[in-house]
A protein has these predicted regions:
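Hydrophobic alpha-helical and helix-loop surface patches within well-folded domains
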Residues: 172, 200-452, 456-459
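A surface-exposed beta-strand-loop module
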Residues: 43-45, 52-108, 129, 164-165, ...
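Long, ordered, helix-rich scaffold segments
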Residues: 373-374, 515-873
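Extended, low-hydrophobicity, Ser/Thr/Pro/Gly-biased non-transmembrane segments
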Residues: 91-194, 219-221, 432, 556-559
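Surface-exposed beta-strand/loop patches in extracellular or lumenal glycoproteins
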Residues: 37-56, 127-129, 135-144, 415, ...
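Short, hydrophobic/aromatic-enriched beta-strand segments in well-ordered soluble domains
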Residues: 35-40, 53, 84-99, 137-145, ...
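Beta-strand-rich binding/interaction modules
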Residues: 47, 57-63, 428-431, 439-527, ...
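N-terminal, polar/Ser/Thr-rich
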Residues: 1-33, 106-115, 127, 131, ...
């Protein structure tokens, strides 16, 4: 397999630009004929014109005349083109129904959809398919009216008509220049849900959501989420929508979550369709977040886009930050923040510590699809959040305004964004640039002491070596800090000439001491409040100090962090006891702290999240020679101990939560709202503990299942809690669930995820059986993710000592890679942990990776990842 590596340092501006793109799609059966007419502007006259493409080429003309060309390795090269502006016409043929990669133009459910980011447009026609070539598009679509009554593309509809043979046509015009990755087309038999939004300047924007007729009743929440996002972006950022219409199309076969194509967003059905019987509260929150994210891209991604794909985080990190802020304003801000940090630690921290570690702005890539990563998105959002922490809301908004003033309508870089933030605030952010170029999660080791009426806090930063770079420079790291006395009361201190209760300490050196003055009593530092930087922080807290932080810190994130540290220590104590064959410890400090959590006055959503232990991945994050089963057993033992210790309290909290839900009006009792969602989350946490502590309770669940499962949040909570039970009751209830929702594709995804995440002895066998379930298709990304990626995260079964879990996932990676490399590449990342495993498992996993690597015709997507794992030192 030949490798082409692309390097950031090799960037060169395009030799040609495309001022105008006129597309004509003639949708036939089975082929679609695509004609493009491009107005091309030479930037460096004399150089050959090179276009990207993999479609079947029918003809090429320059200024109306056929020309000679060379077509090789998906590059179309035309020499001797005019030195002044000229017209290039290209005709191609594509077969959407045969396109199983779901990139370019493809068929799903009898309809046609596109996905062009990052390099799907070249599957449709030949083009300068890179984000810094921005063009104004018009698109004409011709198709059979009965088969394809709906014909959509970007921008505003400007013309249309019918032919005598039963075919019809529509012409769309996008008045804003855009790169090819933002092109979209949809053709099919779809139902529309309409609404309107009036912008802050008084313009009336039409909103259209397209789904199947059956799914039409499930789009209401997504429509309201869009209107809320449009209003929020005006209020928070002063950004107004710029077209006459905003369209969203939902499709069940989709590689990603959603795509922000200008004026015509295409969404995975998972992030559009919901009602309380089929979607959990978490699903509703996901819809709100993703709808917001894609809408916010209209300015941060579309109006200002990326110069090249190395700059992907310019649009994605910034837009994730914006959607996180939107979600934080819609519900409990601290709970949403904790959710974001948990995801970062669960997925991005391991990525930063593994063979595929890369900076927020990668320096090189083989396959661009592989860089739609947690690092680029979630760590990228944390980088943007650090600007906000350093500059404050006012300073951040000044930077955003300057960014748009300078760059509206341009394709720019992460450095351009940093320059806007720095220049708008008169601050030097040169050192901050290292967040874009250095991979790895910084580790902060802190020590504190009381000296001469001040608290001295010394912080040492270490950035671990990563495959791309061994030696790292000290970074600019904001550490939001407060102090508590031994009774838990906030202590004021002097910093930079002010008397404050909280300060942002900016670490810029490898080791630095901060002096917090006017402190005359023993204090407990509350560090990295609100997770002010994406780092790992170590401080030698005593268990009593952690208990004080959990009980009394004014910063709720810091309270949660203290609980996580107590859990972490308890799990590790269990590991030690299990390894030495000793009885498990009683964990008095943790149990005393949890007694406060279960009995104190807490917001229900916050209480529920305090009860969630760190995952196994969190526990072993900084370790080598990992035995996953040992960590899993230690964590399970702690869960069981907590369940038994507080069984009466779980029952009482469950009763209180049910009472709160029942007090709501019957019409909305089981619908989504942030308040009721908090009570339901707490109730599901209590149910899980009750079922752990009281084995007989499953019979009560079986007898009262219908009464208890009043919406999907309850039903999912119950099934998750009994999912690892070996009794026939679990099988019976899961089968009943599948029968009830057999015709709902998204709920069946939940069913397959339950099967794959069970800890029962027969889980692998049940997963293999599910592959042949009539509602399962391995070609559907949602189904593949729900069953296979869920299984790859099942610690005891994926890491089974006999290697059966590794072998099974390797087989599926190779199978999927033949038709959808993008999904296969996501699945193969389960093997990223290989070189951190203990010797036996490492050897078994390495053998499976070598087997994948030897597969004939292995895609670049999978080959790049496997190669990095096998070559990791």
């Amino acid at each position: 397999m030949s490798k082409t590596v692309h390097y950031l340092k090799d960037y060169a501006a395009p030799a040609y630009r495309i001022l105008k793109t006129d597309l004509h799609f003639d949708i036939l059966e089975p082929q679609t004929i695509v004609k493009s007419s491009l107005t091309v502007q030479p930037e460096r006259a004399g150089e050959p014109l090179v276009l990207d493409g993999s479609a079947k080429l029918l003809s090429v003309k320059v200024n109306g005349r056929a020309v000679d060309y060379v077509l090789e390795d998906e590059k179309l090269t035309i020499a001797g083109v005019p030195s002044e502006n000229f017209t290039l016409e290209v005709e191609t043929e594509i077969l959407p129904a045969e396109n199983k990669s779901l990139m370019g133009l493809y068929a799903s459910g009898g309809n046609l959809f596109t996905q062009c980011e990052p390099e799907g447009f070249r599957k449709i026609t030949f083009y300068i398919d890179r984000p810094d070539v921005m063009s104004k598009f018009t698109t004409t679509i011709v198709a059979d009216k009965k088969r394809y009554p709906v014909l959509l593309s970007n921008g505003n509809k400007i013309d249309g008509g019918e032919f005598s043979d039963g075919r019809h046509w529509v012409k769309w015009e996008d008045p804003f220049a855009k790169p090819s990755y933002l092109f979209a087309l949809v053709a099919g038999d779809l139902a529309v849900t309409e609404d309107y939004f009036t912008t802050m300047s008084g313009r009336k924007v039409k909103i259209e959501f397209y789904t199947t007729e059956t799914d039409k009743p499930k789009v209401g929440f997504a429509v309201e989420s869009l209107k809320n996002a449009m209003k929020w972006d005006e209020t928070r950022f002063g950004l107004e929508y710029d077209l006459d219409i905003f369209m969203v199309v939902a499709v069940g076969d989709f590689n990603m979550g959603a795509m922000e194509n200008k004026g015509l967003n295409i969404f995975n059905t998972k992030f559009v369709l919901a009602n309380s019987r089929t979607a959990t509260d978490t699903d509703f929150e996901g819809i709100e977040s993703v709808v917001g994210h894609e809408y916010f891209h209209n300015w941060t991604g579309n109006r200002v886009t990326c110069r090249d794909w190395f700059q992907l985080s310019l649009k994605e990190g910034l837009t994730v930050f914006r959607d996180q802020e939107f979600s934080g304003d819609r519900a409990s801000r601290v709970v949403r923040r904790i959710d974001n940090v948990r995801m970062l630690r669960l997925f991005q921290f391991p990525e930063d510590a593994g063979p595929t570690a890369h900076p927020v702005r990668p320096a090189s890539y083989e396959e661009m699809n592989n860089f739609y990563t947690m690092t680029v998105y979630e760590k990228g959002a944390e980088v943007v959040r650090m600007y906000h922490t350093l500059l404050g809301e006012e300073g951040f908004q000044k930077g955003m305004k300057l960014y748009f003033q300078r760059h509206d309508g341009q394709a720019v870089t992460c450095d351009d964004f940093r320059a806007a933030m720095a220049d708008a605030n008169g601050i030097n952010l040169d050192q901050f640039a290292l967040w874009y170029s250095q991979a790895g999660t910084p580790v902060l080791d802190a020590q504190g002491r009381l000296k001469d009426g001040a608290f001295e806090l010394t912080i040492k930063q270490t950035i671990p070596a990563t495959p791309d770079m061994a030696d790292k420079q000290p970074m600019m790291i904001p550490v939001k800090t407060g102090l508590l006395n031994e009774k838990g009361k906030a202590v004021e201190f002097e910093y930079q000439g002010k008397r404050v209760k909280e300060a942002v300490l900016v670490l810029t050196e490898a080791e630095q001491t901060f002096v917090l003055g006017g402190v005359n009593e023993p204090v407990i530092p509350s560090l990295l409040r609100d997770f002010s930087a994406p780092v790992t922080l170590n401080y030698p807290y005593s268990e009593q100090e952690l208990a004080t932080l959990l009980a009394a810190d004014e910063n709720e994130f810091a309270r949660w962090e203290a609980a996580q540290t107590l859990y972490h220590r308890a799990i590790n104590a269990n590991r030690q006891a299990l390894a030495e064959g000793r009885p498990l410890p009683e964990h008095k400090a943790l149990m005393d702290a949890l007694a406060l959590v279960v009995s104190g006055d807490f917001d229900p959503a916050f209480r529920a999240i305090l009860l969630q232990m760190p995952s196994e991945t969190d526990v072993w994050a900084e370790e080598e020679n990992i035995d996953p089963i040992q960590v899993h057993q230690a964590r399970e033992a702690l869960l069981n101990a907590v369940a038994v210790k507080f069984l009466p309290q779980w029952r009482e909290l469950n009763r209180q939560a049910a009472e709160q839900e029942n007090q709501a009006d019957a019409a909305v009792r089981y619908e989504y709202s942030p308040e009721l969602a908090g009570w339901r989350t707490l109730r599901n946490a209590c149910r899980a503990f009750i079922l752990r502590a009281d084995a007989a309770h499953i019979e009560h669940v079986a007898e009262n299942y219908e009464a208890m499962a009043q919406n999907m949040t309850h039903e999912w909570g119950i099934l998750s809690a009994i999912n690892s039970n070996e009794s026939e009751i679990r099988d019976r209830l899961l089968t009943k669930f599948a029968d009830k929702f057999a015709d709902d594709a998204l709920v069946m995804d939940k069913y397959f995820a339950l099967i794959a995440s069970s800890r029962r002895k027969d889980t692998l066998q049940q997963v293999q059986t599910a592959l042949n379930h009539p509602k399962f298709s391995i070609e559907n990304p949602n189904k593949a993710r729900s069953l296979l990626i869920s299984f790859s995260r099942n610690i005891p079964h994926f890491h089974a000592e006999d290697g059966s879990g590794y072998r099974f996932i390797a087989d599926k990676v190779m199978e999927i890679d033949r038709f959808n490399p993008q999904v296969a590449a996501r699945l193969v990342q389960a093997f990223n942990i290989c070189n951190k495993l203990e010797a036996n498992r490492k050897a078994v996993m390495t053998k499976e990776l070598q087997r994948i690597n030897a597969q004939e015709g292995l895609s670049k997507d999978v080959g790049e990842i496997v190669g990095k794992i096998l070559n990791e030192k």
